[in-house]
């Protein structure tokens, strides 16, 4: 799947037009609580002539279940947001300083679900690189890129089954990359993207 690292932007757009179920996703919560909406930006950036994805590492906070985790920039939908694309762009600007006008939205993946009762819309885009990022330190400790060529190598990740509330759920773990460990919902979104990009339109 190394050809994914050099796909043209038009081919990425074409492949995003297809409908493909989320990969290794957890089912939506079936309790009575209304599901909360969130969106993340999945940014393709060009590094040394090949695509990489831009990730963040969350800042450490006591009693925060997402503290220190690797993620895509993003967050909760707000009523002032026109749509979920706007949510992803606003949150990315707030968290790492990327201007919305510098982002080219290509499409989106199907919804993913988190164990914290969120329905997440992954918005796929490109942006210039390198970029002068400004981190909101209360939320973001670091940013880094991982080459798509590395992410598509099946020797770099594994899927395990975990029992939560009596249900067997898949948990995806990538091998550490420069000390960063990609797992959980962000890892599932990454695999969904790879699966979608790997099928011809």
Locations of the language-model features?
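N-terminal leader/linker segments that precede catalytic domains of diphosphate-processing enzymes
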Residues: 1-71, 76-94, 98-131, 149, ...
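Acidic, negatively charged sequence signal
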Residues: 155, 159-163
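Short, flexible helix/strand-to-coil boundary loops that buttress conserved ligand/catalytic motifs
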Residues: 137, 155, 194
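Acidic, glycine-rich loop-and-strand cores that form catalytic or ligand-binding grooves
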Residues: 133-150
């Amino acid at each position: 799947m190394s050809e994914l690292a050099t796909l043209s932007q038009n081919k990425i757009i074409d492949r995003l037009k297809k409908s493909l179920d989320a990969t290794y996703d957890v089912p939506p919560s079936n309790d009575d609580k209304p599901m909360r909406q969130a969106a993340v930006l999945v940014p393709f950036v060009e590094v040394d002539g090949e695509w990489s994805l831009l990730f963040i590492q969350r800042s450490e906070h006591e009693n925060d279940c997402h503290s220190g985790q690797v993620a895509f920039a993003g967050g909760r939908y707000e009523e002032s947001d026109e749509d979920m694309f706007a949510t992803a762009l606003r949150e990315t600007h707030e968290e790492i300083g990327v201007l919305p006008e510098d982002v080219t939205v290509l499409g989106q993946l199907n919804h993913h679900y988190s164990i914290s009762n969120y329905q997440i819309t992954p918005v796929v885009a490109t942006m210039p690189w390198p970029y002068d990022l400004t981190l909101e330190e209360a939320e973001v400790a670091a940013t880094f890129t991982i080459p798509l060529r590395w992410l598509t190598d099946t020797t770099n990740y594994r899927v395990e089954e975990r029992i939560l509330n009596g249900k067997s759920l898949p948990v995806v773990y990538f091998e550490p990359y420069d000390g960063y460990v990609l797992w959980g919902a962000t890892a599932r979104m990454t695999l969904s993207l790879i699966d979608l990009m790997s099928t011809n339109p």
